[in-house]
Structures are given as C-alpha cells and as structure tokens.
UniProtKB/Swiss-Prot annotation:
One of its GO terms (molecular function) is tRNA (guanine(46)-N7)-methyltransferase activity. Its EC number is 2.1.1.33. Pathway: tRNA modification; N(7)-methylguanine-tRNA biosynthesis. This is tRNA (guanine-N(7)-)-methyltransferase. It holds the Pfam family Methyltransf_4. It comes from Maricaulis maris (strain MCS10). Catalyzes the formation of N(7)-methylguanine at position 46 (m7G46) in tRNA.
Length: 228
C-alpha cells in the first residue's frame, strides 16, 4: 500500500493533495499503520475478502477527515467500511481516529476514487456514501464534479441489487446536477416520498463538524437511491 495518491494520466486530481505538515505521530501512522489497513496496490479489490468476518460492505468516497466514516464503523461493527480520500491530512486524521478506537472494520486508500473504483469487484458493495463533495460552482468546472455518467455507471456496477447510494450536499446547483444524472437512470430509484425524506437527515446519518459549518447556499439535502 503506497502513501502517495495514484497517478493515472487519464485523470487529473483537482485541488490540494496535502496541506500543513503532518505531526510526527501522524507521519508514523501513515508510514506504518496505513499499509496494514490499506487496499492492495494493484489487482482486483474484493471488499468481502478484505474483511471476511463482516456481513455488509460500505464505501465512503472523499471521507475528508474521516469523522463520518469512523463513526459509522463504530456504530456498525458488522459492516466493513472502505474509505477513499486523496488529501493526505484527511487520511492522517482518519488513521488517528481509527487507531484510537481500535477499529478492525475499516480499510483506507489515499487515492482518486475515479482511478480505483474500476478495480472493485462487480456487485461487491451494499452501500456507497458521497457526502458533501466539492461542488465546483463555476459552469466551466462542471465536468470536475464527481457525479458524472462514468461514475454513475460505476455506482450501478458496484452496488448489489438492493444496495444504497447516498449523496448529500448543501449546494443547490449540485443537488440539481445529481438529480439530473440519477433520476433518469432506471438502475436507481430515488427513495424520497415526502419533502422530509430529503430535507431531514436519514435516521442513520451521522452529522459532522464540516456539515454544521453551513458553507453551501442551501440547507443540507440527502438523496438516497436504491439500486434496482
């Protein structure tokens, strides 16, 4: 397991991959702990084989500092969680929390998820979380948004029938973008029946400090889709 984000010329990673220097403890966790709980450097990825004693498998794309990922793993010990995040400081924070909690049901990758998702086995996940991704407000940057046809196809391939995709955002244009991308795809069924279903956090949602900062232009929107 490498500690550098994967480099594929077909993809360009937008935004920073590292902020301030890591502390000595964080660097030690990146050097020593990350290889132990990391994903394989190459070849297919089978989440069930990585964590065979877990009943379900979930993925969080862009986990930031790992607050949601770690809390979900603590609350759901029978689920194996995989987190993918390119930002080194976020990975280091997540490693610190995982180590402190002694969690055995989390695996991490410091990578661009667009590069690593094709390596996952088909129908290998029960749930995918994409929470408050970079909205790329400017129209000329719209193609940088994570939710595109190519990633939608990957979501459909990776989720088991009956699996769930949850996207959350506090940016109206991004919510509209996601609905356009997914609502017309007959592989997914939007689960909202009333306004409360998408304007209130789902019962199993874990609110993070980032979410409470209200950095977007609307209240948080939660879009849950069922894989048919």
């Amino acid at each position: 397991m490498t500690t550098e984000p994967t480099q594929n010329p077909a993809f360009r990673l937008f935004g920073r991959s590292q902020g301030k220097p890591l502390s000595a403890r964080q660097q030690r966790l990146v050097d020593e702990f990350l290889p132990r709980i990391g994903l394989p450097d190459d070849g297919p990825i089978d989440p069930a084989a990585l964590m065979p004693d877990r009943r379900r498998q979930a993925l969080e794309i862009g986990f930031g500092g790992g607050e949601h990922l770690v809390a979900q793993a603590e609350a759901n010990p029978q689920t194996g969680f995989i987190g993918i995040e390119p930002f080194l400081n976020g990975v280091a924070k997540a490693l610190t929390a995982i180590d402190a909690a002694g969690l055995g049901n989390v695996r991490l990758a410091r990578a661009d998820a667009r590069e690593i998702l094709p390596r996952f086995e088909t129908a290998s996940l029960d749930q995918i979380f994409l929470l408050f991704p970079d909205p790329w407000h400017k129209k000329r940057h719209a193609k940088r948004r994570f939710v595109q046809q190519s990633t939608r196809d990957e979501f459909a391939r990776l989720l088991k029938p009956g699996g769930r995709l949850r996207i959350a955002t506090d940016v109206k244009s991004y919510a509209d973008h996601c609905m356009v991308e997914l609502s017309g795809d007959d592989r997914f069924i939007w689960q909202a029946r009333t306004a409360d279903d998408w304007t209130l956090p789902p019962a199993d949602h874990i609110t993070t400090r980032y979410e409470t900062k209200n950095l977007g232009d609307c209240a948080p929107v939660f879009m849950d889709f069922l894989r048919v």
